[in-house]
């Protein structure tokens, strides 16, 4: 009897493998979009065409992946910039009028490793300083 069971074992094992259903693909979890966040320095004074402003988006996050790119729109007519680094420096373009504050909406869009995106914006107040030797702003 023992010999008969030994001869059947491979057949039963094969039968169990064939009868047991295979693993089915589970539906992929939906992508959770990233959250954009940034700070900048200096906040004031920002002199148009002169002051380098440092932007830092390290506070941005993606709960189910990684942030693949940071896209910055400056609001001052200069081309947007895309980078893989969360930090960047920008000098705002000269304004059309001297001694007047101009408010630009800076927009950050972060894109995650699955193509999801999130955005945040802040206002930057920029002033065109007077020409050297001319009257000072009042």
Annotate each PLM feature.
Residues 9-20:
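Bacterial N-terminal signal peptides
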Residues 1-6:
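N-terminal secretory signal peptides that target proteins for export/translocation
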Residues 23-138:
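Extracellular/lumenal mature domains of secreted and surface-exposed proteins
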């Amino acid at each position: 009897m023992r010999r008969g069971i030994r001869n059947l074992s491979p057949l039963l094992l094969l039968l169990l493998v064939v009868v047991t259903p295979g693993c089915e693909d589970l539906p992929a979890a939906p992508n959770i979009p990233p959250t954009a966040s940034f700070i900048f320095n200096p906040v004031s004074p920002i002199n148009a065409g002169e002051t380098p402003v440092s932007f830092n988006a390290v506070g941005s996050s993606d709960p189910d992946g990684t942030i693949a790119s940071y896209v910055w729109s400056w609001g001052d007519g200069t081309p947007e910039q895309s980078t893989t680094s969360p930090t960047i420096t920008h000098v705002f373009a000269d304004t059309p009028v001297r001694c007047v504050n101009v408010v630009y909406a800076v927009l950050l869009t972060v894109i995650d490793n699955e193509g999801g995106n999130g955005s945040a914006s802040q206002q930057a107040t920029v002033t065109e300083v007077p020409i050297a030797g001319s009257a000072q702003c009042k």
